[in-house]
């Protein structure tokens, strides 16, 4: 979305998955599709447009794990271990133990509606923030990156 008169640019993505005939779930897009959007936002922030750029992700809260709709694991298979570089983009997720599998990630609702700074591995994280909008009873969740 682009509001030319204000020079606002907002990238919006809707997360969804699909269930195959065999009963397994698959995410709708590869991680690289989202990585491109994060990279675009961070380049815009670095060029001084923090207050004019955002990346919004929305999804229905209808699956037992966000990993059913977003590739947060490393490797293939039905229970991949968490990819630390990817999970760093989601400060509103928590691990249940140190050897966490992507399917075991849970929402950390205590930080919902609060600004969270991103702590990305190997990157300058200055000015990279996120707000998670949702609670366990909500039908739809949002993550706004700015």
Predicted segment positions?
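Glutamate identity and glutamate-enriched acidic tracts
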Residues: 4, 11, 33, 43-44, ...
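Mg2+/Mn2+-dependent nuclease catalytic core
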Residues: 17-40, 44
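Non-catalytic C-terminal interaction segments of nucleic acid-processing enzymes
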Residues: 68-146
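Nucleic-acid nuclease catalytic cores
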Residues: 44-74
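Residue-identity detector for threonine
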Residues: 13, 24-26, 100, 126
């Amino acid at each position: 979305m682009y509001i030319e008169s204000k020079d606002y640019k907002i990238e919006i993505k809707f997360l969804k998955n699909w269930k195959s005939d065999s009963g397994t779930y698959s995410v709708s897009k590869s991680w690289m599709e989202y990585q491109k959007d994060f990279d675009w936002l961070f380049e815009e922030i670095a060029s001084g447009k923090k207050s004019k750029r955002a990346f919004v992700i929305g999804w229905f809260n209808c699956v037992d794990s966000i990993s059913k709709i977003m590739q947060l694991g490393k490797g293939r298979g039905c229970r991949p271990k968490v990819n630390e570089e990817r999970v760093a983009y989601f400060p509103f997720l928590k691990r249940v133990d140190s050897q966490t599998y992507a399917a075991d990630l849970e929402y950390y609702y205590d930080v919902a509606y609060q600004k969270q700074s991103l702590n990305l591995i190997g990157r300058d994280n200055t000015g990279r923030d996120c707000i998670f909008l949702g609670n366990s009873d909500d039908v739809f969740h949002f993550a706004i990156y700015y």
